[in-house]
Amino acid sequence: TFNLLESCRKFFYSLDVEKKSKFIFHHISTDEVFGSLGEKGRFSESTPYDPRSPYSASKASSDHLVRSWYHTFGLPVIVTNCSNNFGPWQFPEKLIPLVTLKGIQKEPIPLYGDGCNIRDWLFVEDHVDALLLAALKGKVGETYCIGGYGEKSNKEIVLKICEILDNEIPNQTPHNKLIKYVLDRPGHDKRYAINPSKIETELGWKPKYGLEKGLRKTVLWYLKNYDWCQNIFKKGNYRLERLGK
């Protein structure tokens, strides 16, 4: 992030006045920088930072760097913090493609801890629409939180994927019989949820897909594009496991 900011600062300073007026550094971040929620409430642009993992701490530091380049050097920036993305083409180690592909292959489906950790799921095309609006119509120096109104526990997501697979691959043992509870991930935050009212009110964004429609589209994509996943397995050492901590 530091290198990108410095390169963009130098480039920005080299532009004429007209081109400077059209320049923006759009920093795309995560809701994990805000920490973990209790049973109620949602993250917003005014939520204090409380990162609880090495990953979220690094993302939080990059957010602060971006804002410091804005305040110190006048670099025009916009920051967006999004909830959990999903959709076609996502690398198989993430929860939704991992569960889908495990189900297709009739392999055990891992579910961390008690499966009750909650995430706010955002379909990738809805996220892209929000990013374009923020970049083209957002106010310089502002932050916009992007969430999909898709709060579900990991267990609920896994069961829904199993239900879709049962409908698409009938006459087999129900896919939920493949679920296997495994040791929880270190530092596994309990709940994330975003209040996207600012970007809705100020920029007119609304999710078009939502969780149910987006999840079905995603599972069907992996069913139809299984060869794409097989190529990933052939070209590397990845074998459908969660990566990182």
Where would I find each of the regions flagged by the language model?
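Short glycine-/acidic-enriched loop or helix-start segments at secondary-structure transitions
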Residues: 36-38, 89, 155-157
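N-terminal Rossmann-like NAD(P)+-binding domain of SDR-like oxidoreductases, especially those catalyzing
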Residues: 1-85, 125, 131, 217-245
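Active-site proximal helix/loop that lines the substrate pocket
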Residues: 30-33, 84-90, 116, 136, ...
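C-terminal substrate-binding subdomain of Rossmann-fold SDR/epimerase-dehydratase oxidoreductases
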Residues: 97, 103-245
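Hydrophobic alpha-helix immediately C-terminal to the catalytic Tyr-X-X-X-Lys motif of short-chain
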Residues: 61, 65, 69, 99, ...
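Short coil/turn segments at alpha/beta junctions that flank glycine-rich nucleotide-binding fingerprints
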Residues: 72-76, 92-93, 138
